[in-house]
């Protein structure tokens, strides 16, 4: 038998083998046997140097044609086997069965509480204002009655970009910016991120704060108390008790700290099992925000006449409200992106 005959016999031999190949594994064995580096086609072509020079072109041409035919046979059989395997899989699939629903994401708990607070104040007639997180020294300090060398600046570890440019330490600069742009009456809240050099269980370098203020004729401390009491009872529950304690802030006079009855122990200082409350440290009260009547010096910096207008301002940390509302003990959990933690608020 000549080499040409041997080459041409490979095609029917492979066709018979493919008819018996019932799996992709068997098909691969046949491919190696016929087309592998040591397969039958390679063995025949290894004898090509034995031929006379004039015979080699004919054998080479035949070998190329046979190789193409073998590849075509393999491809067709492989396609057929893959279709059979897919059909077998589909035969076990019931399209009427319900699918698996993907997990639905949700807003971050801090965002949820911030949105809730904004909705409460929108219901009280307040506008929502926003502004730059990179502030100048004037709007962050001086216009709020904190000139250079003022001791109140030591209360805040400030992150400076340049000598007079900084990352805002509170959202109070928006009080100044808004009052410069608007004439009384003005009522607005300013939610946003603020930055301070601090990091522990209850502090992070970046956190969220909401500044609120109202200016009009004859605004009094009673208006401030009524507004904040209404707000806190809407967020923490109508049975929440609220108390005001004298305090100091450079941009308000008089100033106060606001406490609410502890959410964890119901304001009793101890839990039902007699264990002392770790949140309020058995006092029954937890600090929630700072507030006061806007200082006349702040009015002067924005062009308001303090003899005609009065107003109040308050500020609160959104993370603190969220921690108290949901009983979260470590502030850093908000920023660790632990899905197990976040899913609890979905």
From Swiss-Prot:
Keywords: Aminoacyl-tRNA synthetase, ATP-binding, Cytoplasm, Ligase, Magnesium, Metal-binding, Nucleotide-binding, Protein biosynthesis. Binds 2 magnesium ions per tetramer. Pfam families: Phe_tRNA-synt_N (PF02912), tRNA-synt_2d (PF01409). Its main location: cytoplasm. One of its GO terms (cellular component) is cytoplasm. Its EC number is 6.1.1.20. Its cofactor is Mg(2+). It comes from the Bacteria. GO terms for molecular function: ATP binding; magnesium ion binding; phenylalanine-tRNA ligase activity; tRNA binding. GO terms for biological process: phenylalanyl-tRNA aminoacylation. SUPFAM superfamilies: Class II aaRS and biotin synthetases (SSF55681), tRNA-binding arm (SSF46589). It catalyses: tRNA(Phe) + L-phenylalanine + ATP = L-phenylalanyl-tRNA(Phe) + AMP + diphosphate + H(+). InterPro entries: aa-tRNA-synth_II (IPR006195), aa-tRNA-synth_II/BPL/LPL (IPR045864), Phe-tRNA-synth_IIc_asu (IPR004529), Phe-tRNA_ligase_II_N (IPR004188), Phe_tRNA_ligase_alpha1_bac (IPR022911), Phenylalanyl-tRNA_Synthase (IPR002319), tRNA-bd_arm (IPR010978). It is found in: Cytoplasm. Belongs to the class-II aminoacyl-tRNA synthetase family. Phe-tRNA synthetase alpha subunit type 1 subfamily. Tetramer of two alpha and two beta subunits. This is Phenylalanine--tRNA ligase alpha subunit. The gene is pheS.
């Amino acid at each position: 038998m000549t080499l040409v005959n041997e080459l041409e016999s490979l095609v029917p031999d492979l066709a018979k083998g493919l008819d018996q190949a019932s799996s992709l594994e068997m098909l691969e064995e046949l491919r190696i046997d016929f087309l592998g580096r040591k397969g039958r086609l390679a063995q025949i072509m290894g004898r090509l140097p034995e031929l006379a020079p004039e015979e080699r072109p004919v054998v080479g041409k035949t070998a190329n044609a046979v190789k193409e035919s073998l590849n075509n046979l393999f491809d067709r059989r492989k396609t057929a086997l893959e279709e059979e395997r897919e059909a077998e899989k589909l035969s076990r699939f019931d399209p009427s069965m319900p699918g698996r629903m993907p997990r639905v994401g949700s807003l971050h708990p801090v965002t949820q509480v911030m949105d809730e607070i904004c909705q409460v104040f929108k219901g009280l007639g307040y506008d929502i204002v926003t502004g730059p997180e990179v502030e100048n020294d004037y709007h962050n300090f001086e216009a709020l009655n904190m000139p250079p060398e003022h001791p109140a600046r030591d209360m805040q570890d400030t992150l400076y970009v340049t000598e007079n440019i900084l990352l805002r330490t509170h959202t109070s600069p928006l009080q100044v910016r808004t009052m410069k742009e608007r004439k009384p009456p003005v009522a607005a809240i300013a939610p946003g991120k603020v930055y301070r050099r601090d990091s522990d269980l209850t502090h992070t370098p970046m956190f969220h704060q909401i500044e609120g203020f109202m200016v009009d004729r004859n605004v009094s401390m009673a208006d401030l108390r009524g507004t904040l009491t209404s707000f806190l009872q809407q967020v923490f529950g109508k049975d929440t008790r609220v108390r005001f304690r004298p305090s100091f802030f450079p941009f308000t006079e008089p100033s106060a700290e606001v406490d609410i009855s502890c959410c964890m122990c119901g304001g009793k200082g101890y839990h039902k099992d007699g264990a002392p409350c770790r949140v309020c440290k058995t006092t029954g009260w937890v600090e929630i925000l700072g507030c006061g009547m806007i200082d006349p010096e702040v009015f002067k910096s924005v062009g308001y006449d303090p003899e005609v207008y009065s107003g109040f301002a308050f500020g609160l940390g959104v993370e603190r409200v969220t921690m108290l509302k949901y009983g979260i003990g470590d502030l850093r959990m908000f920023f660790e992106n632990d899905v197990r933690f976040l899913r609890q608020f979905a």
